[in-house]
């Protein structure tokens, strides 16, 4: 789930999405691209396919499947475009971001495991941020589980 905190326009870098790409299965991701630290799907893998821009008003939400190919356009506005994303997955399943905390939103089997304290959530993120910035977190911030050794990478 992608939430627009401010208006997201084509000029200020809204998301783009390739319709139906989630049906094609996992895509090669490379973490050594110059454009971002987070693993990205190389342009060569998409063979020139362009995404459809998804402008969203402030407070608007975009929902998509985890295998949907998406990216943000560059922010050419000179202003701020602010958003947040929430990733939902079954309890115990890796998020792909081992440096960052997760939490249980709902559990019929174990309601006591649900995190309902926003201060506890904020504290967990503060601790994670401090560990990454100080160098105490020595693992990979993002999992490189998608064929980083592929020729295209």
Language-model-detected regions and their locations in the chain:
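Non-heme Fe(II)/2-oxoglutarate
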Residues: 61, 68-153
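Double-stranded beta-helix
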Residues: 8-69
